[in-house]
From Swiss-Prot:
Protein name (Swiss-Prot/TrEMBL): Cell division protein DivIB
Domain called POTRA: residue spans: 44-112
InterPro entries reported in the protein's UniProt record: DivIB, FtsQ_DivIB, POTRA, POTRA_FtsQ_type
Any GO CC annotation of this UniProt entry: cell division site
Domain of life: Bacteria
Keyword match Ribonucleoprotein: no
Stored Pfam families: POTRA_1
Topology of the protein relative to the lipid bilayer: Single-pass type II membrane protein
Length: 254
């Protein structure tokens, strides 16, 4: 009778379920075994660390700050942690970490732009970055089109503001500025004096520099060397010729 076959069907179903469980367990064990073998193999380790874009920080400095080393667990490396650690270096503005399987960590460094150089008491120059950080020039070389800051105190609050202002001005507009020195007065505590390679003398303030730079370049391009004042009002006065030199020239022509 049909009812006599029901126990047999239940036994078959039980066997099938047991077989499936065993198969699943075997698959899981196989996956675990593969994972153990993988994490013990060289494929799971950092095999190469690359840096690019760094000028003021050496490879050793970046490695020490990041804590990275060849042989570290590749999947244990946190891109956000590395970026955060490297951005603690004052010359670094942005960090991008690119993990390339298997084993390669490529780190792209963006440093703050150099806006000026500073003359030290021993005659050496240090690069001044857009955030006001002073760094050793080293083997990176000097960009001759950048101004030199002289007579600035290290704790002068207007120095960092000046660097920020310079970073916002196109490089071709500051290329003629050769030197910037502080020249504060009671009414203008952030007053500065600038000298240009084209023999102009410029008086302005840190806070006005960005808004006055277009006027400055207009005068530099169209006028003879002279004194340019860019404060509440703008003015230009050409330098008077040296009468003594003119007299000497006349004597030699007679």
């Amino acid at each position: 009778m049909p009812n006599a076959q029901i126990p047999v069907l239940k036994k078959n179903r039980t066997k099938k379920r047991t077989s499936r469980k065993i198969a699943i367990l075997l698959i899981l064990l196989f996956i675990v075994l593969l994972a153990v073998l993988f994490f013990r193999s060289s494929l799971s380790r950092v095999s190469e660390i690359r840096f690019d874009g760094n000028v003021f920080s050496t490879r050793d400095q970046l490695l020490n700050r990041s804590g990275l080393a060849v042989g570290d667990q590749y999947f244990g490396v946190s891109s956000s942690d590395i970026s955060e650690k490297l951005r603690e270096i004052q010359s670094i503005q942005q960090v991008t970490v690119d993990k390339q399987f298997p084993g390669i960590i490529a780190i792209h460094i963006k440093e703050f732009a150099t806006v000026a150089y500073e003359l030290q008491s021993d005659g050496s120059l240090r690069a001044i970055l857009a955030n006001g950080t002073s760094v050793s020039v080293g083997s990176s070389g000097i960009a001759v089109e950048k101004p030199i800051l002289t007579k600035w105190r290290s704790d002068d609050p207007y120095k960092a503001k000046l660097c920020d202002a310079l970073s916002r001005i196109p490089g071709e507009w500051t290329a003629d500025i050769s030197e910037i020195i502080p020249a504060p007065i009671p009414s203008f505590p952030d007053r500065i004096k600038m000298y240009t390679r084209s023999q102009f003398e410029v008086i302005t303030t840190v806070s006005l520099l960005n808004s006055k730079i277009s006027y400055l370049n207009q005068v530099l391009e169209t006028e003879d060397p002279g004194l340019i004042t860019m404060l509440e009002a703008d003015s230009y006065v050409p330098f008077k010729p040296d009468t003594s030199e003119e007299g000497q020239e006349k004597d030699t022509t007679q």
